[in-house]
């Protein structure tokens, strides 16, 4: 028997050794091929090659084959990676955007930062940085010029709307760190905290916020993680630690390399083990945000309110590369206290399916499978592989514009909710008319009331409507487009003449009238207008304060928080 076991162990070792040898040969073979192919191209291709661009595109194609989170950062892009992890960069502290005429403008300055302090305003058109003409530059190119070493100074020339002369501003770059907590406040007897990202120190910011709100009489806490795409894992663990005991396992990472195997536990005494807690989530709540919401759900410490989260259960780490570059790559999956992994998309399976489709032209059938059931600390059932499902689901009557338009919407939950109601709102938000109206309003109103007291008038709406119509505003009419496509399909298949009467009736129904469409969406348009005005006086904090005045997720959270028996029932207590 011992001889048989020894033989089996020896055979297994040989198989492993053989597999590793084959793998190493394959790696060496294709690296040699890549190197040889590039050298042949460099020598004999009809045009001269730009080595950095050609080879970098090859590297990017390789990383894109894996997942969206594995990214190569050359030396010139390391500032972007640093900003993602720390929230810090050297610059002026303002968001910029491009107008339809291809000029770049100040879009949203941050409070107490160089742009705001020197007097730059929303709508200012950027013309020159020192002697560098910005005409024809993209926003990324202008942004690169605005950033630099803290302490360096430059002269920024701008054209302010409705002024004939240009203005020059002397701006000194500073180390910019966006606050992860743009707003805290009281909603009745509940404390509200908006957390936008998990950067260095954010858990401490939340701690201070909770203490401040409790001093103001908060009997419960609402933590808003909507549109929070995540960030640093250790900050997520430290945040959960505020509400759960010391030495509690929060998340475990598992990967191929031993360095990726790690268990994260709470290291500090908690801030408050008893205060009722609600976590707001949506389909853009991802990564570290899902660790927080998922761990607090698994430990039956908080109710989760909103819509199902994104489902990113992958962990990235950075590896230093030669020539001061870096590779951010996926090294592990994370598992929250119940043992579940909430990663939604299996990228390896996607690659296999794509290969089958490439070879056969057929898409593999999706197999229905039961999701594995896990249990919270109190025995409640939860599942893996689909993000975090809320304990209190809030159904929003909306369809995301990303189904029709492959561009980013907004990273602010309140704005996303509005834009998902109508393509008219989507286009108005991205149109210059909204900024132009906001600039006109700002220039004629030196001050603004407190956010809680601010309202727009019917005349304000009429003024905006007039600016929209005068600007020759156009928006994509998807219903008309889809109807036209359906007509062509019906003609191709020979059904059009039979259904012509119905098609004609639909054409009349779908005929767009801007006046009618705007008036139908007047309340939502006024919310967009209010956000555009408020940011000029009260910055992002004011926008959040205004948005939560009418928020379905917050209303749902408050309903449960104000009902102790329902709160305990949901948590299984």
Label each PLM-derived region with a short phrase:
Residues 1-27:
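Bacterial Sec-dependent N-terminal signal peptides
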Residues 19-30, 34-51, 105-109, 113-122, ...:
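Cleft-lining beta-strand/loop regions that shape enzyme active-site pockets
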Residues 27, 43-50, 65-72, 101-104, ...:
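Short, solvent-exposed loop/turn elements at domain surfaces
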Residues 44-54, 70-75, 221, 251-254, ...:
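Surface-exposed patches in mature extracellular/periplasmic domains of secreted proteins
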Residues 45-105, 153-172, 176-183, 551-558, ...:
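Extended, small/polar residue-biased N-terminal targeting/export presequences
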Residues 283-286, 294, 298-305, 310-388:
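Acidic, polar loop-rich interaction surfaces within structured domains
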Residues 341-342, 346-573:
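Conserved functional hotspot residues or short segments at active or partner-binding sites
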């Amino acid at each position: 028997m011992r001889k048989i076991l020894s033989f089996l162990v020896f055979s297994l070792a040989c198989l492993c050794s053989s597999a590793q040898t084959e793998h190493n040969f394959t790696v060496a073979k294709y690296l040699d091929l890549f190197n040889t192919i590039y050298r042949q191209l460099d020598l004999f291709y009809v045009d001269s090659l730009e080595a950095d661009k050609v080879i970098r595109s090859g590297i990017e194609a390789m990383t894109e084959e894996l997942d969206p989170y594995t990214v190569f950062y050359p030396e010139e892009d390391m500032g972007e990676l640093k900003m993602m992890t720390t929230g810090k960069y050297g610059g002026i502290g303002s968001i910029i955007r491009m107008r339809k005429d291809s000029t770049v403008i100040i879009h949203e300055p941050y409070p107490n930062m160089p742009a705001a302090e020197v007097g730059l305003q929303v709508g200012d058109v950027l013309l020159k940085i020192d002697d560098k003409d910005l005409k024809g530059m993209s926003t990324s190119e202008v942004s690169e010029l605005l950033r630099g070493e803290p302490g360096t100074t430059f002269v920024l020339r701008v054209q302010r709307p409705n002024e004939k002369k240009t203005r020059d501003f002397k701006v000194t770059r500073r180390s910019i760190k966006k606050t992860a907590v743009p707003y805290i406040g009281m909603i009745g007897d509940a404390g509200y905290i908006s957390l936008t990202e998990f950067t260095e120190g954010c858990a401490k910011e939340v701690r201070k916020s909770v203490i401040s709100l409790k001093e103001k009489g908060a009997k419960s806490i609402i933590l808003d993680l909507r549109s929070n795409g995540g960030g640093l894992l250790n900050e997520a663990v430290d945040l959960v630690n505020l509400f759960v005991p010391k030495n509690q396992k929060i998340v475990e990472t598992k990967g191929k390399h031993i360095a990726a195997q790690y268990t994260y536990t709470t290291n500090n005494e908690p801030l408050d083990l008893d205060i009722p807690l609600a976590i707001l989530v949506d389909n853009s709540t991802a990564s570290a945000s899902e660790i927080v919401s998922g761990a607090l759900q698994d430990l039956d410490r908080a109710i989760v309110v909103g819509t199902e989260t994104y489902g990113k259960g992958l962990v990235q780490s950075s590896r230093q590369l030669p020539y001061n570059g870096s590779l951010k790559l996926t090294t592990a999956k994370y598992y929250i206290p119940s043992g579940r992994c909430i990663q939604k998309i299996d990228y390896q399976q996607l690659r296999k399916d794509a290969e089958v489709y490439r070879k056969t032209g057929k898409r593999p059938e999706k197999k229905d499978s039961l999701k594995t059931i896990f249990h919270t600390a109190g025995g409640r059932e939860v599942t893996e592989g689909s993000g975090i499902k809320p304990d209190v689901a809030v159904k929003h009557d909306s369809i995301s514009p990303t189904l029709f338009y492959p561009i980013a919407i907004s990273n602010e939950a309140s704005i996303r909710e509005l834009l998902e109601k109508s393509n008219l709102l989507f286009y108005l938000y991205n149109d210059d008319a909204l900024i132009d109206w906001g600039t006109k309003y700002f220039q004629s109103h030196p001050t603004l009331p407190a956010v809680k007291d601010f309202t727009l008038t019917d005349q304000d709406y009429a003024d905006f409507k007039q600016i929209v119509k005068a600007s020759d505003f156009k928006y994509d009419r998807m219903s008309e487009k889809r109807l036209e496509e359906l007509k062509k399909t019906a003609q191709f298949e020979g059904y059009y003449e039979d259904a012509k009467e119905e098609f004609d009736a639909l054409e009349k129904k779908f005929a767009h009238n801007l006046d009618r469409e705007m008036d139908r969406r007047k309340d939502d348009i006024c919310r967009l207008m209010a956000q555009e005005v408020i940011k000029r006086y009260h910055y992002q904090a004011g926008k959040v304060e205004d948005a939560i005045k009418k928020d379905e997720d917050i209303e749902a959270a408050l309903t449960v928080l104000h009902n102790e028996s329902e709160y305990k029932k949901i948590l299984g207590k």
